[in-house]
């Protein structure tokens, strides 16, 4: 709800800041313009997931012993080699896990988009969770809604199995 107020075209602080800085002359209706609405929703979804992703990555990187970094530097490894030969093999499963969580988070993100745009303008932010909700509660086609939800659930389970293979892979450095 806060973002809806911040992005409001006439009184929102985002438009006021952009005008004061001189980036725009006229107010932009971020949530009412199909050119902006989806990008704004994607950005806000990213902002919701970002702190959790940083926490996961920092925990994955804290597992790497400092001695390994020092040993690679003594051996003359460049930062690129340290990244490709030390950090990515150890943090790779966590990156894969974060990717999977991001996909699940995005597929299940109903409330943000519904509160901001309700799937509009011109269906530019009309996502699968909103379709499932509208089929069930606006059109009262519960069977179709359940079928769609089952398909999304099956897809997420299949993705979970694929990503799971990389989560539990034994890492040797």
Regions found by a protein language model. Give the residues of each.
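A structural signal for multi-pass alpha-helical bundles of membrane permease subunits
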Residues: 1-173
């Amino acid at each position: 709800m806060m973002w809806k107020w911040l992005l409001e075209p006439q009184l929102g602080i985002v438009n006021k800041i952009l005008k004061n800085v001189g980036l725009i002359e006229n107010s932009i209706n971020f949530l009412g313009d199909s050119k902006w609405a989806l990008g704004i929703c994607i950005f806000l979804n990213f902002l919701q997931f970002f702190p959790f992703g940083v926490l996961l990555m920092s925990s994955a990187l804290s597992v790497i012993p400092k001695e390994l970094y020092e040993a690679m530097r003594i051996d003359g490894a460049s930062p690129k080699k340290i990244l490709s030969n030390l950090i990515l093999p150890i943090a790779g499963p966590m990156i894969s896990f974060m990717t999977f969580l991001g996909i699940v988070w995005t597929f299940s993100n109903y409330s943000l988009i519904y509160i901001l745009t309700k799937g509009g303008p011109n269906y530019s932010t009309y996502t699968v969770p909103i379709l499932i909700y509208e089929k069930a509660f606006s059109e009262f086609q519960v069977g179709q809604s359940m079928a769609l939800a089952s398909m999304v659930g099956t897809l997420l389970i299949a993705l979970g199995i694929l990503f799971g293979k990389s989560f539990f892979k034994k890492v040797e450095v």
